[in-house]
Every structure is written in C-alpha cells, then in structure tokens.
Amino acid sequence: MSDVKTSPAAEPQTAQPPVRPIAWPAGVAGVVLVIAGSFLSWSYDGSILNDLSIDFYPGGLQILAIIAAVLALVLLLAERGPLTAMGTWLDATLGLRALGAGLTLYMALIVVAISVESDGLINVNPGAYVSLAGAALILACAWMLPLRQLRDLSKARLPAWSEILAIAVMMAAVLFGAAYALGLTDAWSFILCLLFFATVIVALVRTGVITWFGHVGQRHKKVLTLAAFVVAFFFPFTQGGSDANMSIATQVLIFAATAIGLNIVVGLAGLLDLGYIAFLGSGAYVAAMLSESAFATIDWHPPFPVVVLIGACVAATLGLIIGSPTLRVSGDYLAIVTLGFGEIFRLAMFNLDGINGPLLTNGPNGIPGIPELQIGGFNFGDEHTVAGLELGRFSNYYFLLLILIAFVILVFARLNESRIGRGWVAIREDEKAAEAMGVNVFGLKVLAFAIGAFLAGLAGTIKAHQDAAVSPDQYIFLESAFLLAAVVLGGMGTIAGVLLGATILKLLPEKLRFFSEYRLMLFGLLLVLMMRFRPEGLVASRRRQLEFHEEDEELAVAVEEERLIVEEAK
C-alpha cells in the first residue's frame, strides 16, 4: 500500500491499549494448528462430507479451512509484521475477531456433522479437533489484540491498474466460489460452505475491505459492471453440463428480473404491491397462448420477438388498469387492493376454460407442451458444444435471460438517475411535499406500475418456454411475497441488493430441500431479523442507510463523501 495517497490530516494515531505479549504468537500458533489439522483426516468414512478421510490430501471443506487460516495469517501480519502499512488502513483486529468466530463455528459444525453422520464423536478423527483448537486459539488471540485508530479508507488510492486488478480478482473469486458451492450435493457440505463464505464476507466487512472495494467500484463503475457480466457469462462453462444447476440459475434470473421490476414500484416509488406475480403470469400466459403448443387457444403464432412485445404490453396494460383506480389510495389500503388483484388474476386463469368463460387458458389444466424457443434457426432445446464443453437447453435459456437481465438493469439504472426517478423518490419520502413542489404524483405512480409490469411481462414470456407449461397454481400469493422479500432482503432501491436477495431466496430452497417443511418459518424469521438489525437490506445504498439511521453522524459524513467520489468519477 506504499502507493496509497492520503492527506496529512488522515495520518493514523498511535495504538492506545498495549498488546498482550502472548496474543500475536498465539494467533500464529492457531493458524499453524488449523492448517496442520486440515492435512490430517477428519473422518474414517469417505462418504461423509465429500470424503475428508485421507491424510495429507485435503478435501474441499479442509481446503476452505486452510484458506480461512491463511486470511487470518494475513491479518496477523497486518497487525505486526511486513504488512503493518496495510494495517494502518484496515481494521485487522475486528476482521480477525470475525474470522476467528466464524472459523470456530465452522469447525464445530464439522465435528457435529461428522458425529451425526457416523453415529458418534468417537468417529471424528483427531485432525478435526486439531483444527478446531487452532480456530479457537485464533479467536482468543483476536480478543487480546487492541483496536487501533485508522486512516480514512475513502481517501485510499491505488494506481488505476491495481484497482482494476482488484475488481478482477474479486469477480474471479465470486465465479469459482459459486461454481464450487453449486457443485456440492451433500446438504451438510453446502451449509458449511455457506458458513465459510459468510465468515469471509463478514471479516472483509469488519476490516473495511468491502468499504474500500465499494469506493473502487464507484471510481470504476463501468469496469465493475463489465466484470460482473463476464463472470455471469462464463458461469455455465464451470458447471460441466449440469442441467440441475443451470435450471436453478435460470430460475434465479427470471426471479431477479421480475424482482427488479418490483423494485421500481416498491424501492423507488414506495408503493407496496402484494400481487406483482400476476404481471409475470400475464406475460407467461400470452406466450403460451401464442405458442405452437397443441393446447394453445389462439391460432396465431407470431415470431418470438413479437410475442415478447405483446406479452410485455399486456402486462403493462394490466398495470395501468390496476394502477389507475387504486393509486388514489396508499399504504395498507393499496397493499390490500394489489393483493386482491393478484388473486383475481389467478382465479380468472382458472375460469377462462371455455365453460365458465371464454376458452383462453384451459382453466386449472393450464397450457402444457409449450415448444422450445426458436429464434433465427437457433433452437434453445438443442445441446451445443463450445470449447469441448456441453451446454444444454438450460444454458441456452440462461444466456437469453442474461440479455434480459442486462436490459432490465439498464432500464432501472437510467430511470433511477433520471428526473422520473427523482420524482419517484420524492413521492416515496413525502408524497404531500412532492405534490406541493409540482410533482405529478398520480402520473408517476401509474408510470411506476406500468414500467414494473412491463419488465415482469418480458420475463414471463421467456419463463413460459423455459418451463414448457403454465398453470394458475404457479402464480399464487406466496410467489408475490417472495418477490417482495427479495427486494426487502437485498435492499430496496438497489440493483446488486435485489440480485443478491433473489439469489438467496431461489437458491437456498433448491439446495436445502430437507428444510422444505420449515421454509416459510425460516424465511419469516430471516425477515424479522432483517427488520430488527438491518432494515435497509443486505446491500443498501448509503443514502438508504441514512434514512434508517438518521442519528448516525459518521454515516452522514460517509454519504457526503460517497457523493463527492461519484462526482469525481464522472
């Protein structure tokens, strides 16, 4: 960090509490124990936790423990050693505490998992206990180290090429981490992998690395966006032709595209919509009715680009129809009306069966047998070989959905930065004040509903072909609740937050099916905890954080500094 620039006023103060002499050596000893234990076997049975039974040949979970130990060593060297210059910027002590706590919990759960799977603690090999002892020693060491006053990270600068390299390294870590996690079929291994990632992320947050990376992202926003899409593009090539994982990925993208549309309504305009899944369903039903399925009810089969536009426009029209009369109300009343609209849509799809109404949807049977998409001679149902790697039908739909996500993100970002977006935010903050300032409150509310519905309709047209069938039971209130949960969990008004929230709410139920009976209870508990401890969401903008923490003067200063950084980047 010798190239880091700072103002004289930002020079660090000396450490206050004295370091206990034993703390640092104990931490290094803990690192050595974790690594040494990871090279020993942790269980006798090779079928447990993807085989941790071979000495001097670490398995996947053992390698993760080694990585955590190496990170702990880096933080120790930042506290005392050749990396102390970095330690004047990053809070090594807080990071080490988070890493030590997470690693101790990780090793304890591994011991529990092995004992449960092999019927007793006696079947846990000594290597696991050695690593557990090392993790506990790292944690104890971290609490003996003093806290320091640090330089202001917002003033940290590296050469542009170094910051771009940091973005590339971070994105590569995300790609390989996601590929490894999705490749785990054992539930215990997947949970432990998630715990490892959570530990590393929390440690990086506590040290300040994530804050610094946020400033870097602001300075190189285009590079970060490009890197994110490059990672997403190469993701199918890491799955070895696995249709199971790519099926999950396509569902995540459909869910995310729809959630970003809802984010316009909820996150920007502040309108609570509990029936949003109906707009996704309207797009899907339009695509199904205009498809070449033997059960399609309309004898007209236009090209898919035309179908996409029709489906999106039908959804937007429904948004206008529901929005125009109902947006005169607000708050709880609006939520009740939109909830009713979602149920009306589902019941209408049940009744348009040729008996209770016109024959459009085949009633509860839906429209099955929807053929694969075919655009310009390219059949999305065919397998293709690229660079020796097999890409199945779900990979084909994944790339199409990636284009859709790029479009949806572009629309959201442009609207958010436009006069319309500022009008929505003004309405969300104080509707009466916005109206007094001349903002067309009703018009902007209706526009938010229409644009959000349009984007959901786009996703629905692709979903119909990807699922090969549509039925009313796919578009129940619970799906609207999960969409709203994705927006709230990730961070209202943000793009990255909604993408993260959508990924969590779609991925975890698929990988943790043995928790299916408790899914709703766990998600409800998660939302309650979020509302209590982080109401702004996992990835909230600084301004959104300030809305929930008005008393935080340091946060207010950080918001202003972030604004200056953005202006400087422009």
Predicted regions and their residues:
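Extracellular/periplasmic helix-loop junction at the C-terminal end of a transmembrane helix
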Residues: 119, 152-153, 180-191, 345-386, ...
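Pore- or pathway-lining transmembrane helices of multi-pass membrane proteins that form conduits
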Residues: 275-281, 328-353, 361-362, 474-488, ...
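Alpha-helical transmembrane segments within multi-pass membrane transporters and channels
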Residues: 297-343, 500-501
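Transmembrane alpha-helical segments in multi-pass inner-membrane proteins
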Residues: 97-104, 110-113, 277, 300, ...
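Single transmembrane alpha-helix segments in multi-pass membrane proteins
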Residues: 69-72, 242-294, 324-334, 338, ...
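Cytosolic-side transmembrane-helix boundaries in multi-pass membrane proteins
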Residues: 1-25, 75, 79-102, 124-232, ...
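Helix-loop-helix "hairpin" substructures at the membrane interface of multi-pass membrane proteins
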Residues: 392-471
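Membrane-embedded helix boundary and interhelical linker motif in transport proteins
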Residues: 117-125, 269, 276-320
